[in-house]
């Protein structure tokens, strides 16, 4: 038997339709609930087919986002109180917009061929919600709260053609009834062509993001700051109020997303969800914001971060993270709190056959699908996982097994599943075989004829 509660409307709706429908009476009791004509919930039960019963909606009127009523705090703009150990940082964000589903779970990850007495745990930030937006949600909760506070009516951000951050930003903007403008970097031979609907592009275009393409050469020559400034100036001249989010959402405000995540991990450890403490934090580094937040948070919490960069080089990230930490008046040297190693392989979002084969093997062995953009690397406690990072870690475990013996490691799975859809041609030779099932024509049906199932 299958059961579902169906809420639907014959009209188009904007974010939080349930809240809008119930706003007039948040204490609606069960009797009123059954008799009020415009507010009905139907339980539909069927053995094989689920029927959908329509709920009549109130007349639709366009209004700006209103968060005066919400369920479980989702899509609400709340005052933010930092952890006590981070209260000296400055500036401290005043508000946080609840966009994700937190805390994300932690569970054991049974990776094959681990060194003796090595435990690996996985924190599932890939389950943070917002259309598989992974770790990007944490940064956007603070950035979007700031955009709303500044009265923005649209968002600008920039990244690669398969940027997880850009896709997450496009979704978050629509949650809040804001337009989104994306500047996406691609090859010079494709910059004048339709970018298609593969992976993140499909979601971005479904939610109505405005896409401007630039070549990698233009991006390198002009830079992300100037490109976003040019688009911002254009929109301001059109009477818009744009809010610019940098590459990866990585600035001193976005860093708070993973300062908050460290507090979340602390609380999960205190509740006994992991059965033990961890030794260090290991992350894959793409734009710097995540490792900066984890770095300052873990340093204040007495942990150390080991980061594996998937683009640029370690020195670049040390300097970039230092700028972010200085922006928070953290009073700490980036090289004292994080250990950055190179794991970019062919480069950001580029993979060798060996790396993709590894992603497939991990999925087959554990059921966990990794992002191919970031390499799987492991060192000590918390690893932000993606394909490239874990690959590097497992390789280091084979080459230096004594380094890992007895270690307790936490991987943070940062999401990015949609990036795999841009790798289908490379993945095709690596996935399992298929065949047509051999069925003899004379085999009779055992449960009669004319049934669908």
Kindly give the residue locations of the regions a language model identified.
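PLP-dependent amino-acid enzyme catalytic core
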Residues: 2-33, 38-453
